[in-house]
Amino acid sequence: APNFDRGDPVSVLDFFTAATAKWPVWLPIPAKYRDRAAACLARVHGEDLLDRPMGGLSGGQLQRVLLALALEPVPHILILDEPLSGVDIEGEHQLLDMLDELRTQYDLSIFLSTHDFATLSQFADKVILLNRRVLKLGPPEEVLSSPEFYETFHLRMGKGGA
């Protein structure tokens, strides 16, 4: 995720408007752009962030803003690279619950890269183990207990398998 200086005056509304509208952010932002940004943030339960400075957001709040931006317009496929990095445990659960809600509401396919294997087993319905090529594909419990998984991460398997 991008880093914003705590003293940076750019608000979430400024950031959203700069990314979604052809409107210079140094001019007053018309109500239609404000309403659009608020509606997008509402998808991720982030309406209260609209006027906050980007530099004052927590990791989880920043992920919400970036997710709202990625959902404008709502895609068929959402690709997220390490979306839980910089997010605390409570924020992780909120973000995963929200992704599950969005997946259902918008019939989204979500591709999520992570090294957080606990997340995989709770959130994913399919896991792809990659190491320059597909090593294993299947349900989380199958992939995470496979010899390919253990070999990839140089882990030892217990007696009788994983």
Give the location of each predicted region.
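H-loop/switch region of ABC-family ATPase nucleotide-binding domains
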Residues: T114-H115
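Helix N-cap at the start of a conserved alpha-helix in ABC-type nucleotide-binding domains
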Residues: I89-G91
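Conserved ABC ATPase signature
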Residues: P53-L57
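Conserved catalytic motifs of ABC-family nucleotide-binding domains
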Residues: V74
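Conserved beta-strand-loop-alpha-helix hinge in the C-terminal portion
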Residues: R133-R156
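Conserved ABC ATPase "signature" region
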Residues: T17, A31-L49
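Catalytic Walker B motif of ABC-type/P-loop ATPase nucleotide-binding domains
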Residues: L78-E82
